Amino acid sequence: MILIIDNYDSFAYNLVQYVGEFDDVTVRRNDAIDVEGIHELDPDGIVVSPGPGTPAEAGVSIDVFAETEYPALGVCLGHQALCAAHGTPVGHAPSVVHGKPSEVRHDGTRLYDGVDDPFEVGRYHSLAVKASELPDTLSETAHTNDEQGIVMGVQHAEKPHIGVQFHPESILTDAGKQIVENFCTGIAKA
């Protein structure tokens, strides 16, 4: 079973549909569960959804990455929560991007198995992290293929925690379903 933390965003239910093709799904709002409740559910993996606001305003989202060892995928706000959980400043992106495609390069790690490099992604965000501010515990796995090189993916060095700034569940993202499948059937089941 995959637990989806819903950060009060309609995109969460696109993720529910994708994840539901590969595993059973349980959804909890970010303020309706705590770490103890997560342990009681004992999921195979956790997806922390996109949402409005900042990681500090996203209920249990930061705690998923700071206080659990479950395989976890953070999407957009979830990605920012992963970064914030490990001390990375989350600030304004160089430009606000909502509903726009971008070309992204990735490093070929497990999340990107079967995904072309580069590939198109759908972006919907005004916040971002800088590669130069990532701690040693997080490594960049994807970035925009342009002069800005905005961080689009990170992975924890020891925990099975991964973040993507883009939206794999967006129709604008090539191979988005493949990315979700890679998490559900590979990373969460490892």
From Swiss-Prot:
Q: What class of enzyme is it?
A: lyase
- Report the PROSITE patterns cross-referenced here: GATASE_TYPE_1 (PS51273)
Question: Which keywords are on file for this protein?
Answer: Amino-acid biosynthesis, Aromatic amino acid biosynthesis, Glutamine amidotransferase, Lyase, Plasmid, Tryptophan biosynthesis
Query: Which Cys-Cys disulfides exist here?
Result: none
- For the Glutamine amidotransferase type-1 domain, which residue ranges apply? 1-190
SUPFAM superfamilies assigned: Class I glutamine amidotransferase-like
Active-site residues annotated for this sequence: C76, H167, E169
**Which Gene Ontology MF annotations are present?**
anthranilate synthase activity
Q: What is its EC number?
A: 4.1.3.27
One BP annotation, GO: L-tryptophan biosynthetic process
Keyword check for Amino-acid biosynthesis = yes
Tell me the residue numbers annotated for binding L-glutamine. G51, P52, G53, Q80, S126, L127
Which InterPro entries does this one have? Answer: Anth_synth/Amidotransfase (IPR050472), Class_I_gatase-like (IPR029062), GATASE (IPR017926), TrpG/PapA_dom (IPR006221)
Report if keyword Cell membrane is assigned: no
Gene Ontology cellular component annotations, sorted alphabetically: cytosol
**Which reactions fall under this protein's catalytic activity?**
chorismate + L-glutamine = anthranilate + pyruvate + L-glutamate + H(+)
The metabolic or biological pathway listed in the UniProt record of this protein is:
Amino-acid biosynthesis; L-tryptophan biosynthesis; L-tryptophan from chorismate: step 1/5
Task: Describe the subunit structure.
Answer: Tetramer of two components I and two components II.
Q: Which NCBIfam families match?
A: trpG_papA
**Leftover remarks:** Component I catalyzes the formation of anthranilate using ammonia rather than glutamine, whereas component II provides glutamine amidotransferase activity.
Protein name as catalogued? Anthranilate synthase component II
